[in-house]
Amino acid sequence: MPDQRTLLQVDGVTKVFPGVRALDNVTFSVLTGEVHGLVGENGAGKSTLMAVATGALVPEEGRVVIDGVEAVGDTEKARSLGLAIVRQEPALMPELTLAENLYLGVPEAERPSLMDLSGWAQRLLEQWSHGVAIDTGTRVLSLNPEERFIVEIVKALAAKPKVLVLDEPTEHLLAEDVERLFERIRRITASGCGVVYISHRIREVQKIANRLTVLRDGQGQGTYQAAGLSEHQIVELIVGRAMDREFPAKSADAASDIIFEVESLSGTGFSNVSLKLRKGEIVGLAGIDGNGQREFMRALTGLIHSRGRAMLNGRPVSLRSSRLCAQAGIVFLPGDRHSEGIFAGLSVRENFSIRSLGLDSMHGLVSRPSEARRTQLAIREYAVKTPSIETDVASLSGGNQQKLALASVLANKPKVILIDEPTQGVDVGARGEIYEVLREAARHGTAIIVVSSDAEEVAGLSDRVMIFSRGHIVKELHGDSVVESNITTAILTATAHRERGFDRVGRFWKWAAGDWAPILILAVIIFVLGLYASHVNESYLSARNLSGVLALVATLAIVSYGQQVLMLAGGIDLSVGPLMGLVVVILSFYLTDGAPVADQATGWTIVVVAAFAVGVLNWILVDPLGLHPMVATLATFMGLKAISLILRPMPGGLISESLTDGISTTVGFIPLAVIVATVAAVILEFVLYKAKLGLALRGVGSRREAARMAGIMPRRMLFTAHVSCSLLAAAAAIPLMAQVGTGDANTGENYTLAGIAAAVIGGASLFGGRGSFVGALLGALLLTQINVVTTFLNLDDAWQSVLLGAMILAAVTVYSTSRQKVVAG
């Protein structure tokens, strides 16, 4: 169109990593109203180019202009100028709800009031599809991959971008959602938005793109009109050579022996499935996601409990565990390469040998030369491109990671290979190599079962295809009928009667994984324990006893709030106990009877400054310097204890009695301190779930990098969390001071672990992103109650430790198990 203007211009960009020139003088542009396809093999530089465009990476040379404004190396500026990106791996925070992720994912100007968050999110989802059945209050961790990707797309569209980058947007989408995506792309481009469409699926690019740019080895290979190139020409531009055939010739013998057989196999997501597999045969499992084919495959490798009969080489084989299956010769290569297929952080050598260590070991000791020799042979045989066998596997391209994983699986010469999405996220050149590896394994007698969402891939690879619907095999294709059109037709015919997914989690576990479960569970336990104690000893419910219990609760509750703040951000602080002791020691010099007001003010000022300084020190050690939180705060623990002992080698310095009496004031039998602690818990709980600060804090703890992409500053949030933790610990020392009445360097030490325990029992996650201040308050009440109840029941001190340990173990078990059960694949 003559009035088109340039929305995104990347000029002469060069980006160099150690030993690699990822981008070499690349130029790329996106016009108003166009879809610009970006294609190339894995490692060609597509993701690096988009990282430069979005400001996530700073190039050595070149510039980025968004809607006429230069923006290099600034993600926030790129977002504010109207650039949004949908990444191949959704940048979502798993512990936050769907609605909260949408809220943080859009610019400030597009955000609603937090009070209308759920309704706003529901309206956005309905713009995607009126029939969408995703609860906006659902935590992202419990969404399946397709639902997570829909949320990521909806989030990007809600930002009303001028330029939308889509990176492999259809990998996890059902067919109907792919069509919805294309319809939305057409709609936003009609209104002037420019779209960058990155995909390995060349037919999709041809279908949706106006222009396309090809990258190869970090260099542009030209920009073309999409309609002017055939699929074959695009492939040749991508790989730099002619591609005669994508799929190797099929060679299965229909008369070969049956090697693997299952009869009437049933499990979660599938039922009464029977299948026979011959030597050297590749069988494809096809169907819309959620119809049981993946669950069936995982059951065959022992990852999902199943019922039925399985035979390998005519003998019964147990499918109870993946270990037993592997020992029998049944191996599995999962589709989620990053989570289950490779061991990120380990080398190429370790990733290859880890599945076949028996070939390199004797008497439990691994022979490094043997391991290295086998790895070198494997990377040559399977054409794995890697600088060395000691390279971190995470740095390899997706295709090379997949080839290495395949080589690792084949090293033990398995009888049956189960492979889920063999080429997902793999470039077109590596696909052909992977297909050849699978077919070559079949020629040597290995039986293979493949699950793929790509009907063309299933048709090209498979000798037979089983169509799944509603957890059953509803049709079998073999011989000349194994073609893409027949597979697609069979799938679409079957889906008219299919059920979308299966409910795998019981009601109790769903409830236990919620935010209110810890609070209700603790309330019931506290009530029952109190009822029992009062039945055994009537004086338990006396005003004097209850007042004493609640006074102790206030101190523990406030320090547990500090731990809770930090744990929400993914941290922990072992120094809070000695800090409380130091506060009491400092105040014992300034808050004595008859001390001038100026001296008292000086004491309070020193305490605030000291607590702030401790928080800053812990933050510096943990964040900028990168020490583990437990190591860093343990060092602070010892330093604070040393300072307290230097100041007060022996207990001394009586705190003003009038001051301690004031702090110990009660309303009826309820101490003022516990009233303050309760009000503080309610306020902090409100901030946690209804204020931007709480949302940002949980976001950082849930997934730091995703939070950063959403515009949150993780370093700033961690600074806030560390300082808040120390200040709350100092505040907790005030009621503690009233209880001990003198400066003692050992005061407060027990509150380090007790504060953590109260937060954990109250529902905090040790991994960050989740917690409750009301839960921490009840956790503090329960821990204090246990200590008191054992005394009233005439139990010795050992029972205190037993009961406390049992409570912590039970809480962690219930919360962790429930949260794991609701996590979707």
Regions found by a protein language model. Name each.
Residues 35, 527-536, 540-594, 620-627, ...:
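Single transmembrane alpha-helix segments in multi-pass membrane proteins
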Residues 599-607, 613-618, 669-743:
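Helix-loop-helix "hairpin" substructures at the membrane interface of multi-pass membrane proteins
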Residues 453, 615, 729, 739-805:
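Transmembrane alpha-helical segments in multi-pass inner-membrane proteins
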Residues 625, 629-692, 717-720, 739-748, ...:
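Transmembrane helix-bundle core of multi-pass membrane transporters
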Residues 2-503, 511:
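Glycine-rich phosphate-binding loops of nucleotide-dependent enzymes
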